[in-house]
Swiss-Prot record:
Belongs to the globin family. One of its GO terms (molecular function) is oxygen binding. Pfam families: Globin (PF00042). Residues 12-152 form the Globin domain. Heme b binds at H104. It comes from Anadara trapezia. This is Globin, minor.
Length: 152
Protein backbone atom coordinates (compact mmCIF):
# COMPACT_ATOMS: atom_id res chain seq x y z
CA UNK A 1 0.00 0.00 0.00
CA UNK A 2 1.36 3.40 -0.96
CA UNK A 3 1.94 6.09 1.61
CA UNK A 4 0.33 9.51 1.72
CA UNK A 5 3.47 11.14 0.30
CA UNK A 6 3.86 8.58 -2.47
CA UNK A 7 0.25 8.99 -3.58
CA UNK A 8 0.53 12.79 -3.52
CA UNK A 9 3.67 12.56 -5.65
CA UNK A 10 1.93 10.25 -8.12
CA UNK A 11 -0.87 12.78 -8.57
CA UNK A 12 1.48 15.76 -8.95
CA UNK A 13 3.71 13.87 -11.42
CA UNK A 14 0.90 12.63 -13.68
CA UNK A 15 0.46 15.40 -16.26
CA UNK A 16 -2.36 13.61 -18.06
CA UNK A 17 -4.43 13.20 -14.89
CA UNK A 18 -3.71 16.79 -13.86
CA UNK A 19 -5.02 17.97 -17.22
CA UNK A 20 -8.17 15.87 -16.75
CA UNK A 21 -8.65 17.17 -13.21
CA UNK A 22 -8.34 20.77 -14.37
CA UNK A 23 -10.57 20.26 -17.40
CA UNK A 24 -13.30 18.58 -15.38
CA UNK A 25 -12.93 21.08 -12.53
CA UNK A 26 -13.66 23.83 -15.04
CA UNK A 27 -17.02 22.18 -15.68
CA UNK A 28 -17.77 21.17 -12.07
CA UNK A 29 -16.98 24.61 -10.70
CA UNK A 30 -19.38 26.37 -13.05
CA UNK A 31 -22.10 25.71 -10.43
CA UNK A 32 -20.20 24.95 -7.25
CA UNK A 33 -23.20 24.86 -4.94
CA UNK A 34 -25.32 22.78 -7.29
CA UNK A 35 -22.47 20.37 -7.98
CA UNK A 36 -21.74 20.01 -4.26
CA UNK A 37 -25.39 19.35 -3.47
CA UNK A 38 -25.59 16.82 -6.30
CA UNK A 39 -22.50 15.05 -4.97
CA UNK A 40 -23.92 14.88 -1.45
CA UNK A 41 -27.34 13.68 -2.71
CA UNK A 42 -25.62 10.97 -4.75
CA UNK A 43 -23.60 9.91 -1.70
CA UNK A 44 -26.73 9.63 0.44
CA UNK A 45 -28.60 7.71 -2.29
CA UNK A 46 -25.74 5.35 -3.17
CA UNK A 47 -24.50 4.83 0.40
CA UNK A 48 -27.49 5.43 2.69
CA UNK A 49 -25.43 4.45 5.74
CA UNK A 50 -23.33 7.56 5.16
CA UNK A 51 -26.28 9.68 6.35
CA UNK A 52 -25.40 8.64 9.90
CA UNK A 53 -22.17 10.66 9.67
CA UNK A 54 -24.10 13.81 8.77
CA UNK A 55 -26.65 14.00 11.59
CA UNK A 56 -25.45 17.48 12.55
CA UNK A 57 -26.71 18.75 9.19
CA UNK A 58 -30.33 18.06 10.07
CA UNK A 59 -32.93 16.75 7.61
CA UNK A 60 -30.91 15.91 4.51
CA UNK A 61 -33.74 15.51 2.02
CA UNK A 62 -34.49 19.24 1.97
CA UNK A 63 -31.51 19.99 -0.31
CA UNK A 64 -31.11 23.70 -1.03
CA UNK A 65 -33.53 24.54 1.78
CA UNK A 66 -31.08 23.09 4.31
CA UNK A 67 -28.50 25.82 4.98
CA UNK A 68 -26.16 23.43 6.83
CA UNK A 69 -26.15 20.98 3.92
CA UNK A 70 -25.64 23.85 1.49
CA UNK A 71 -22.77 25.13 3.61
CA UNK A 72 -21.15 21.69 3.70
CA UNK A 73 -21.57 21.31 -0.07
CA UNK A 74 -20.00 24.70 -0.77
CA UNK A 75 -17.14 24.05 1.65
CA UNK A 76 -16.52 20.67 -0.01
CA UNK A 77 -16.31 22.30 -3.42
CA UNK A 78 -13.82 24.90 -2.19
CA UNK A 79 -11.71 22.08 -0.75
CA UNK A 80 -11.69 20.45 -4.19
CA UNK A 81 -10.70 23.81 -5.68
CA UNK A 82 -7.78 23.96 -3.24
CA UNK A 83 -6.70 20.47 -4.30
CA UNK A 84 -6.84 21.36 -8.00
CA UNK A 85 -5.00 24.64 -7.38
CA UNK A 86 -2.22 22.68 -5.62
CA UNK A 87 -1.63 20.08 -8.34
CA UNK A 88 1.77 21.49 -9.31
CA UNK A 89 3.24 21.58 -5.79
CA UNK A 90 3.32 18.34 -3.82
CA UNK A 91 4.02 20.07 -0.51
CA UNK A 92 1.08 22.41 -0.99
CA UNK A 93 -1.17 19.53 -2.03
CA UNK A 94 -0.18 17.60 1.08
CA UNK A 95 -0.90 20.65 3.28
CA UNK A 96 -4.41 21.24 1.95
CA UNK A 97 -5.23 17.53 2.00
CA UNK A 98 -4.02 17.17 5.59
CA UNK A 99 -6.17 20.12 6.68
CA UNK A 100 -9.18 18.58 4.94
CA UNK A 101 -8.41 15.18 6.48
CA UNK A 102 -8.32 16.62 10.02
CA UNK A 103 -11.96 17.67 9.68
CA UNK A 104 -12.91 14.12 8.70
CA UNK A 105 -10.72 12.47 11.33
CA UNK A 106 -12.45 14.60 13.97
CA UNK A 107 -15.77 13.21 12.74
CA UNK A 108 -14.41 9.65 12.81
CA UNK A 109 -14.69 9.12 9.07
CA UNK A 110 -12.37 6.32 8.00
CA UNK A 111 -10.42 6.07 4.77
CA UNK A 112 -12.76 3.29 3.65
CA UNK A 113 -15.85 5.36 4.39
CA UNK A 114 -14.38 8.38 2.63
CA UNK A 115 -13.63 6.24 -0.43
CA UNK A 116 -17.35 5.70 -0.91
CA UNK A 117 -17.43 9.15 -2.52
CA UNK A 118 -15.89 7.78 -5.75
CA UNK A 119 -19.15 6.25 -7.01
CA UNK A 120 -21.21 9.38 -6.35
CA UNK A 121 -18.42 11.47 -7.89
CA UNK A 122 -18.53 9.30 -11.03
CA UNK A 123 -22.28 9.96 -11.28
CA UNK A 124 -21.74 13.73 -10.95
CA UNK A 125 -19.01 13.66 -13.58
CA UNK A 126 -21.22 11.66 -15.95
CA UNK A 127 -23.97 14.28 -15.67
CA UNK A 128 -21.81 17.39 -15.66
CA UNK A 129 -19.34 16.26 -18.36
CA UNK A 130 -22.03 14.95 -20.70
CA UNK A 131 -20.51 13.76 -23.98
CA UNK A 132 -17.04 14.57 -22.64
CA UNK A 133 -17.34 12.06 -19.79
CA UNK A 134 -14.60 9.44 -19.73
CA UNK A 135 -13.56 6.85 -17.15
CA UNK A 136 -10.04 8.34 -17.22
CA UNK A 137 -11.50 11.47 -15.64
CA UNK A 138 -12.96 9.30 -12.88
CA UNK A 139 -9.57 7.60 -12.48
CA UNK A 140 -7.88 10.99 -12.07
CA UNK A 141 -10.34 12.02 -9.35
CA UNK A 142 -10.07 8.59 -7.71
CA UNK A 143 -6.29 9.06 -7.52
CA UNK A 144 -6.79 12.42 -5.83
CA UNK A 145 -9.37 10.92 -3.46
CA UNK A 146 -6.84 8.17 -2.63
CA UNK A 147 -4.46 10.89 -1.41
CA UNK A 148 -7.14 12.06 1.02
CA UNK A 149 -7.83 8.47 2.08
CA UNK A 150 -4.13 7.96 2.83
CA UNK A 151 -4.18 11.06 5.06
CA UNK A 152 -7.09 9.73 7.13
Amino acid sequence: MSTFGELANEVVNNSYHKDLLRLSWGVLSDDMEGTGLMLMANLFNMSPESRLKFGRLGHLSTGRDNSKLRGHSITLMYALKNFVDALDDVDRLKCVVEKFAVNHINRQISAEEFGKIVGPFRAVLRIRMGDYFDEEIVAAWAALIAVVQAAL
